[in-house]
UniProtKB/Swiss-Prot annotation:
Classification lineage: Bacteria, Bacillati, Actinomycetota, Actinomycetes, Propionibacteriales
Superkingdom of the source species: Bacteria
Keywords: ATP-binding, Cytoplasm, Kinase, Nucleotide biosynthesis, Nucleotide-binding, Transferase
Organism name: Cutibacterium acnes (strain DSM 16379 / KPA171202)
Catalytic class of the enzyme: transferase
The protein's assembly and partners: Monomer.
Name of the featured protein: Adenylate kinase
Binding site for ATP: G10, A11, G12, K13, G14, T15, R127, G172
Principal location: cytoplasm
Amino acid sequence: MRLLIMGAPGAGKGTQATAIAEHYSVPAISTGDMFRTNIKNGTELGKKVKAIMDAGDLVPDELTDAIVVDRLNQDDAANGFLLDGYPRNMHQVEALDAYLKEHGQRLDAVISLDVDPELLTQRLLKRAEIEGRTDDNEETIRNRMKVYSSQTEPLLEHYRSAGILVPVDGVGEIDEVRQRIFAALDSKN
């Protein structure tokens, strides 16, 4: 199964991605995690990405596309994957579509976690406090919401018109939301 999980920052994508990936026996591939690993390890890519993420901006498409393609080419993604944090704009949608077409593949579904923006801000501030994430301060959160709204929300319409968007209410206990996701995906396939 080839899946995307989308939602504004703090919607619970990362929280749900691991369980969804395990359920469908595919790797969960998070661009944010890949970037944070590079930052933590002090790689050249990590240094570039840190400055961009600290400002609340999105990493340039060329960097993101290259990292995602490299990861999708690994053996464990041959029979499916769950992408979290990619694509985030139409250029990335086109890059992913081209990759899938070139490999004779298609997306099965795009999960959209829907959560009220005010609740998202509260979640992110709490997460920043618990995890010490420097990319989650109030000003950066507001900027990330704006960037998400302007660049990523139009993708939902693209996937809706392709008939593969699966909207899911992202508010509630983690297990509740997870069961909604499984039910929505199972009814789609």
